[in-house]
């Protein structure tokens, strides 16, 4: 059991028959009354975020979460096939389980698959930055490197983001998966 006084950002708990990851927490000791802990929790099954206040000192059950490094090897209809990088076993995940991550997934990408009690898939963890190919963008004109203007670019996954005018079709760029923003050109082509 985990005491609410031992809460840390990133810890996972089982609460109300759901699995939550602690996003934020704050210990509050008011002048009158007993202390409490305000938390912001993400449901790992649904992705929804809730605010919940625990009384200080109560105990909650920890959730047994494991992360396994896997590589997306191919897509077959509505299923994404991942390979464990340690033992080469393959795992098939339906696109509906991948939700918001689809816009960043491409063949060859390494991700962490998150399991609850070693058998239930509750999500994936993307790298903070990924290198991805530009599938389409309007051509840039000569001298476009001098301004801070942006244009739309469609990436190989179908995601549309804003990029500088000097980026061309076929180039690899680095984007932040948390914000979805362009970071730089990938010079390691």
UniProtKB/Swiss-Prot annotation:
UniProt-annotated location(s): Cytoplasm
Functional note: Involved in peptide bond synthesis. Stimulates efficient translation and peptide-bond synthesis on native or reconstituted 70S ribosomes in vitro. Probably functions indirectly by altering the affinity of the ribosome for aminoacyl-tRNA, thus increasing their reactivity as acceptors for peptidyl transferase.
GO molecular function: translation elongation factor activity
A GO cellular-component term linked to this record: cytoplasm
Keywords of the record: Cytoplasm, Elongation factor, Protein biosynthesis
Pathway: Protein biosynthesis; polypeptide chain elongation
Organism placement in taxonomy: Bacteria, Bacillati, Mycoplasmatota, Mollicutes, Acholeplasmatales
Pfam families named among the record's database cross-references: EFP, EFP_N, Elong-fact-P_C
Protein name: Elongation factor P
InterPro entries given in the database record: Elong-fact-P_C, NA-bd_OB-fold, Rib_uL2_dom2, Transl_elong_fac_P/YeiP, Transl_elong_KOW-like, Transl_elong_P/YeiP_cen, Transl_elong_P/YeiP_CS, Transl_elongation_fac_P
Protein family per UniProt: Belongs to the elongation factor P family.
Organism: Aster yellows witches'-broom phytoplasma (strain AYWB)
Principal cellular location given in the protein's record: cytoplasm
GO BP field: peptide biosynthetic process
NCBIfam families linked: efp (TIGR00038), PRK00529.1 (NF001810)
């Amino acid at each position: 059991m985990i005491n609410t006084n031992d809460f840390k950002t990133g810890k996972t708990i089982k609460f109300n028959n759901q699995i939550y990851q602690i996003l934020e927490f704050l210990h509050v000791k008011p002048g009158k009354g007993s202390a409490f802990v305000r938390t912001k929790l993400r449901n790992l099954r649904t992705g929804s975020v809730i605010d919940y206040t625990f009384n200080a000192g109560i105990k909650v059950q920890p959730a047994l979460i494991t992360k396994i490094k896997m590589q997306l090897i191919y897509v077959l209809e509505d299923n994404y096939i991942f390979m464990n990088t340690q033992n080469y076993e393959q795992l098939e995940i339906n696109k509906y389980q991948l939700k918001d991550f689809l816009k960043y997934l491409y063949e060859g990408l390494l991700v962490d698959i998150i399991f609850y009690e070693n058998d239930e898939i509750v999500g994936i963890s993307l790298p903070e930055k990924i290198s991805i190919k530009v599938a389409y963008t309007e051509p840039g004109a000569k001298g476009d490197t001098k301004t801070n203007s942006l244009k739309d670019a469609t990436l190989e996954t179908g995601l549309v983001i804003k990029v500088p005018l000097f980026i061309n079709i076929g180039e690899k760029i680095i984007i932040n998966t948390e914000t979805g923003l362009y970071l730089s050109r990938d010079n390691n082509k």
